[in-house]
Amino acid sequence: MLSLAAALAVDAVELKVNCERPDSWKIVTEKSVSGDVEEYEFRLSSPTAAVPPRFDVTFDVPQLDAHHKWTTQTEKVTMPPNWSCHTSSRLCASMPLVAFLNDNDRNRICVSASEAMRFVGFEAGLREEDCRIVWKVTFFSEPEAPLSAYSVKLRIDRRDVFFGDAIREGTEWIVRSAGLRPTVPPPAAFEPLYSAWYSFHQDVSDKAIEAECAEAAKLGMKVLIVDDGWQTDDNNRGYAYTGDWEMSKRRFPDMAAHVKKVHALGMKYMIWYGVPMMGLKAKNYERFKGKYLWTSNSRWSGYSCLDPRFPEVREYLISLYEKALREWDLDGLKLDFIDAIGFHGTDPAIGENYAGRDLKALPAAVDRLMKDVFARLKAIKPDVLIEFRQGYIGPAIRQYGNMMRAADCPGDLLANRARTANLRLTSGGTAVHADMLEWHRDERPEAAARYVLSTMFSTIQYSVMLRTYPESHKRMIAHWLKFSRDHRDALLHGSFRPHHYEAFYPWMEAENAAERIVGVYVGGTVVPVDAAAKPNYVLNGTGEGVVFVDSATAATAEVLDTFGAPAGSVSLAKGLNKVVLPVSGYLKVR
């Protein structure tokens, strides 16, 4: 590739723009600086509409007190070499932001791109020859429809600030630069819910769901999601029977009456759809032949991916969702597998000269589909709930949904904690949900509560078969549901700061004007408390019967166990204190 632009300074570092076709495309670069934040705008133009060229922006910076790479895609937090450091983003996968941090929660460099729709490749890793972090940000490396003009911005933030602030501000910069309008979530998006996935998998039925909801409602859960299985009599997993989206009459003989019974318990009702899926055994499969992006017939797939560039594909899907809301009186939908919409190699539309497609660019078609879905469902139910799953969690996705759930991590409290914390940093005001909680019924309630405490700074989804679990587990769940409700403003809407990404967040905190809540998850971690201005709560998610607190003042603390029952009190001296605290219990410091 040929260098198009003269070198631009990033401090003492050269920034270069490289383009595949500099003879037919002109690139103009503009730079603005505000303190330690630099912005670059790259404007491409061509005399006639043409497939845009692949181009990239490269630069490097010295590795100075930078030790860990932060992205939304990986939980590998070490310093990668520059020969194995690729991440990427597009509308329905990840987001165009990468950062490097030090060991003390400080930002060292955070780079974000304004391209929230198309594929963006990020390579950022250490060059071993000279200990420099080498960057390459690539655009138009996937098939793209012809155009004659394009612009994109790059933001390079090298401020010495809390890393979470750099990531949050980089995210909101993308929102502004791309002209995005995230939805405002209704209150129900923050309500704890029951998910039928881990507890039932596909083996769902009206009577069993109603019995579970009766238990869930008594404990304080307000929303239900019925996942895969409602649309088929088959229990063999995979997605061969998706696409028709007709209710299984064996499982749910009268869906509207069933939903009414769940509503009577005080719970809202949502169901799952695999958005682009047309199962190979679906009745409608032949109807849409020639309108698929790709087909997979493996054990865990068995479907073709619909191409939303066809208007009849979009209308088919939207009409299904509208019908479900109207006929069954649903309150929302879990719209899954949007990240499957993409190319597996070449774009099939190119060889067909885009025949039948009213939109040529795939990201534009996904955007159109999801905007129309949200607008038309909202017209039926203004407070409609729409859940999306990590990794389609970028700023553009927030325009179409109001619940962002951590990617599947059954039984993995560490991954759930890290994923929800990362989502809190990038999701703005959108409701962040934990992956569904499950644990063995023979687990001690104090040990089971660690799953709850690890996700306390998100909206929690439970997915255990409540009817078969001990009463002690239900008492524990009920208490923490009440705690999360009583402290929701601080936990979910207050200032949130997760600490030490390199250790998967051994402690996190959130606060509002009235209170501060600290969760500690690794034994031996010292957490600061300062109850002079407001009450502090310290939640013991370590699995050990002690916590270490560094108190700004002498104070008195109530000790409570995992059921919320008083377990004594303790006097804290100013400075370091070793406090005996029940596993999954908590301190209330005043």
Regions found by a protein language model. Give the residues of each.
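Active-site-adjacent "subsite" loops/lids of carbohydrate-active enzymes
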Residues: 184, 191, 198-202, 268-327
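Hydrophobic faces of well-ordered beta-strands that scaffold small-molecule active sites
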Residues: 190-196, 224-226, 269-273, 333-335, ...
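Active-site-proximal substrate-binding groove within the catalytic cores of carbohydrate-active enzymes
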Residues: 145-147, 151, 369-585
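An acidic-aromatic substrate-binding cleft motif
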Residues: 175-215, 219-223, 231-232
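Active-site groove signature of glycoside hydrolases
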Residues: 220-230, 317-351
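Aromatic- and acidic-residue-enriched carbohydrate-binding clefts of CAZyme catalytic domains
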Residues: 230-255, 282-308, 340-367
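N-terminal accessory beta-strand-rich subdomains and adjacent acidic, glycine-rich linkers
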Residues: 10-173, 180, 531-533, 548-550, ...
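Glycine-rich, aromatic-flanked loop segments that form ligand/cofactor-binding clefts
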Residues: 165-181, 222-226, 250-301, 383-387, ...
